[in-house]
A protein has these predicted regions:
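Flavin-dependent oxidoreductase catalytic cores
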Residues: 1-166
Length: 167
């Protein structure tokens, strides 16, 4: 049962036209056996949800749209989505887990310093496994208090180390 996307867009159009909401927050519902698509992994093309965002933008009229495009990895991607008119605000959870300073770095003209989410979905798996969200790219994720840079002190003696299998 239920209703499909066509009906959802019609309902949204009527609600927006009536002035009943201030903004639309687009998220994507998924089937239980495809929960992983809620956070598109590396083998799913970037911005997989853009067609839904475009349809919501059309139905919403002038009501602002916040959307999740799927695998947004850079400020440039978000700016392009906003500039194209597909949305007014973009969501980027994994990009900010991988690099909490992503927006700050972009404002300062240092986006190249930002770590990029590789969509491996370790953040999702770690949360499901033990409730502690961790990140392959950002080892400090979920451990911010333990990795306080002001608490780190240099080793008393320099050491030579060899990294084997660093990839």
């Amino acid at each position: 049962g239920g209703y499909g996307t066509r009906e959802a867009y019609e309902i949204l159009e009527r609600i927006c036209a009536a002035g009943l909401i201030d903004y639309v927050d687009l998220d994507v519902a998924i089937e239980p056996d495809q929960f992983w698509l809620g956070m598109p992994p590396v083998f799913v093309e970037p911005h997989v949800y853009r067609p839904y965002a475009e349809a919501v933008r059309k139905a919403a009229g002038k009501v602002p749209v916040l959307c999740v495009l799927g695998r947004l990895t850079s400020i440039a991607d978000g700016e392009a989505a906003i500039a194209s008119g597909v949305c007014d605000v973009v969501g980027a959870a994994r990009a900010l887990i991988a690099e909490p300073s992503l927006v700050k770095n972009a404002f300062e003209g240092n986006e190249e310093r930002s770590r990029t989410c590789i969509a491996c979905n370790w953040c999702l798996h770690s949360m499901l496994d033990d409730g502690a969200q961790t990140c392959t790219i950002n080892p400090v994720s979920y451990r911010e208090r333990l990795w306080d840079p002001e608490k780190l002190v240099p080793a008393p003696q320099p050491a030579k180390v060899t990294v084997v299998g660093g990839g």
